[in-house]
């Protein structure tokens, strides 16, 4: 009955009633589902981040959106919501390297990104990272946990303190519970549905950095990479590097070719990195636990131990991809010099003091 329907619609409240309409667009059947426009995707995620949709609604939306797969247009709208409502960092006058890796962490291979970030920052390349607490579905080790094991704590800091570290040392990590609590409200819903929703894709495409940058985004499946290119182009991301890294991260493997691509000024260039062609033959270090990783990580920062060769390869590759040097062999020489000089280790000591 129309009157009863209108009464119930009014009882939901404006935000929940509108969100129910948006659920209908992504959750209808094969022949009636229309998907969302960019503006509607922005609106839907904004309603969730501001708490104007309730838990059952958010769960329904996220799982329906996962099943039908977000379009690049929808991802662009959601990315704009993250940009507007999320934390913001700047590196005035300096081009930053910004990494997007899965928030649910690592549980099979030893992470290199904290060590890479420290050494790149020591070389004068600002690095901006972001992450959160252990996250569904993997609940792997997080960037914040890894840094903390090295004596560098990012959790519990104000955003101003993170910006100060970025200004002084060239390295930043925003922590979602502290710096983006609106996004943190989605974590219990993600836990309940037990699958990665499209929001997980945003964590690879978004960065809190504002200004000139090279955005480095990890991926696993080829369709994810092409959607990332389209979505980021739609929001005018100037320079993108996609990396088929370990466990969806941006860590380049040493046991196989590294598959990357650069998108700049609308042109995509596929770049394959073959470690064996440059004398890199180290096996891929496995993950065991934080304490063991800490020992190996501190050794690698001093050019020793089982992670050292993998770190050297990644450091060289990113020095070259960031155009710090013109040729990859030259980058390997520079990476070796930085590790032997313990540049990243020295920065860690300065930041942890």
At which residue positions do the language-model features occur?
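A hydrophobic, small-residue-rich beta->alpha segment in the mid-to-C-terminal subdomain
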Residues: 266-325, 334
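Phosphate/diphosphate-binding glycine-rich loops and adjacent basic-rich segments that engage nucleotide
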Residues: 157-219
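Residue-level signal for inorganic ion chemistry
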Residues: 61, 147, 203, 315, ...
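A generic, well-ordered mixed alpha/beta core segment in the N-terminal half of proteins
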Residues: 94-165
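Short, ordered loop/turn segments at secondary-structure junctions
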Residues: 132-135, 178, 245-247
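Acidic, glycine/proline-rich low-complexity segments that act as flexible tails and inter-domain linkers
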Residues: 2-110, 121-123, 127, 279-284, ...
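Structural motif
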Residues: 95-98, 125-128, 170-178, 196-199, ...
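Glycine-rich ThDP/TPP pyrophosphate-binding loop and its adjacent helix/strand module
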Residues: 211-257
């Amino acid at each position: 009955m129309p009157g009863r329907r209108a009464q119930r619609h009014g009882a939901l409240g404006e935000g929940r009633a509108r969100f129910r309409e948006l659920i209908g667009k992504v959750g209808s059947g094969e022949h009636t589902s229309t998907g969302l426009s960019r503006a509607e995707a922005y609106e839907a995620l904004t309603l969730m981040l501001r708490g104007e949709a309730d838990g059952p609604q958010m769960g329904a939306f996220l799982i329906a959106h996962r099943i039908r797969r977000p379009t690049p247009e929808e991802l662009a709208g959601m990315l704009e919501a993250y940009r507007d409502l999320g934390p913001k960092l700047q590196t005035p006058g300096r081009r930053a390297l910004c990494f997007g890796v899965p928030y649910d962490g690592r549980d099979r291979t030893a992470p290199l990104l904290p060590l890479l970030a420290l050494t790149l920052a020591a070389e004068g390349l600002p690095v901006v990272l972001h992450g959160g607490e252990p996250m569904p579905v993997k609940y792997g080790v997080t960037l914040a946990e890894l840094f903390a094991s090295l004596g560098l704590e990012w959790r519990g800091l104000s955003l101003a303190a993170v910006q100060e570290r970025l200004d002084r040392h060239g390295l930043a990590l925003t922590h979602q519970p502290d710096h983006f609590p609106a996004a943190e409200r989605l974590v219990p819903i993600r836990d309940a549905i037990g699958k990665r929703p499209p929001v997980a894709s945003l964590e690879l495409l978004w960065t809190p950095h504002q200004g000139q940058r090279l955005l480095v985004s990890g991926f696993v499946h080829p369709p994810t990479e092409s959607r990332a290119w389209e979505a980021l182009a739609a929001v005018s991301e100037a320079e993108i590097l996609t990396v088929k890294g370990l466990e969806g991260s941006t860590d380049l493997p040493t046991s196989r070719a590294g598959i990357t691509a650069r998108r700049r000024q609308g042109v995509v260039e596929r770049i394959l990195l073959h470690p064996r062609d440059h004398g890199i033959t180290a096996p891929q270090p496995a993950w065991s636990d934080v304490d063991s990783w800490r020992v190996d990580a501190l050794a690698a920062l001093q050019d020793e131990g089982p992670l050292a060769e993998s770190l050297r390869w990644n450091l060289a590759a990113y020095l070259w991809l960031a155009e710090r040097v013109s040729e990859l062999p030259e980058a390997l020489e520079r990476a070796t010099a930085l590790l032997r000089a313990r540049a990243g280790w020295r920065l860690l000591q300065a930041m942890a003091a």
